[in-house]
């Protein structure tokens, strides 16, 4: 019976590993960012935003703008409030110092 479970486990591994490898290869083609960004106020790069690499080859230019795509699975971003105590916390602090 142990040889049967060993064969079954080996069969599962021979099916699972190629599927995982295929999944990793397909996901590695993505760039890892969303298409919509609430905080991104900059426009797409213009010709002056193109950064040349250290060597003198003109045809090898790198754009300083992130390509945005990751299967659309990242959560939408929402504005983060500014840091600091709220009014409620200020009232608690002031009332405790008065007495």
Curated annotation (Swiss-Prot):
GO terms for biological process: floral organ abscission. The keyword Cytoplasm does not apply. InterPro entries: IDA-like (IPR039639). The keyword Signal applies. It is found in: Secreted, Extracellular space. Residues 36-45 have a biased composition (Polar residues). Residues 36-58, 73-99 are annotated as: Disordered. Its main location: secreted. Keywords: Secreted, Signal. Residues 46-58 have a biased composition (Basic and acidic residues). Expressed in flowers and seedlings. Detected at the base of pedicel, in the floral abscission zone and in vascular tissues. IDL3 is only partially redundant with IDA. This is Protein IDA-LIKE 3.
């Amino acid at each position: 019976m142990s040889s049967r479970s060993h064969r079954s486990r080996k069969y599962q591994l021979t099916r699972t590993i190629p599927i995982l490898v295929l999944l990793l290869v397909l996901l590695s083609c993505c760039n890892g960012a969303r298409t919509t960004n609430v905080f991104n106020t900059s426009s797409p790069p213009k010709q002056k935003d193109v950064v040349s690499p250290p060597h003198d080859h003109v045809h090898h230019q790198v754009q300083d703008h992130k390509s945005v795509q990751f299967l659309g699975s990242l959560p939408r971003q929402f504005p983060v409030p500014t840091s600091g105590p709220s009014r409620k916390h200020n009232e608690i602090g002031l009332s405790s110092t008065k007495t």
